[in-house]
């Protein structure tokens, strides 16, 4: 069970976004697109009343955990996700590397 103040991360596949919930309030999202074996992380947003609490980091970490559990890879388009990956080398193995042919 999750306490009311403990953030909960949910993959809303219908809307193609990871959602971060604080109690009954959706506090943030990561919008994504999918390709075979890959999740393209497009945009991260934390609602203004929840900014400055480290929730973007928790949301991205939760998304990375889910992506890893599903044996998928990541294309980080979102600058917030890219900044997270610079600070969290433990998740860099999930990033799809461009091929030499590109």
Give a label for each model feature:
Residues 2-11:
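Conserved N-terminal entry element of GNAT/NAT acetyltransferase domains
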Residues 16-27:
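Conserved beta-hairpin
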Residues 19, 38-40:
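General beta-strand recognition
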Residues 65-101:
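C-terminal structural segments of small proteins and small subunits
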Residues 25-33, 40:
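Conserved beta-strand in the GNAT
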Residues 44-51:
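A short, internal acetyl-CoA/4′-phosphopantetheine-binding micro-motif in the GNAT/acyltransferase core
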Residues 52-64:
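Conserved acetyl-CoA-binding loop-helix of GNAT-fold acetyltransferases
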């Amino acid at each position: 069970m999750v306490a009311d103040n403990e953030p909960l991360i949910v993959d809303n596949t219908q809307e193609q976004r990871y959602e971060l919930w604080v109690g009954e309030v959706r506090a943030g999202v990561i919008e994504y697109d999918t390709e075979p074996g890959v999740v393209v992380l497009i945009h991260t947003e934390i609602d203004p009343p929840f900014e400055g609490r480290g929730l973007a980091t928790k949301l991205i970490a939760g998304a990375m955990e889910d992506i890893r559990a599903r044996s998928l890879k990541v294309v980080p388009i979102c600058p917030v996700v890219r900044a997270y990956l610079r600070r969290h080398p433990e998740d860099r193995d999930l990033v799809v590397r461009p091929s030499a042919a590109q």
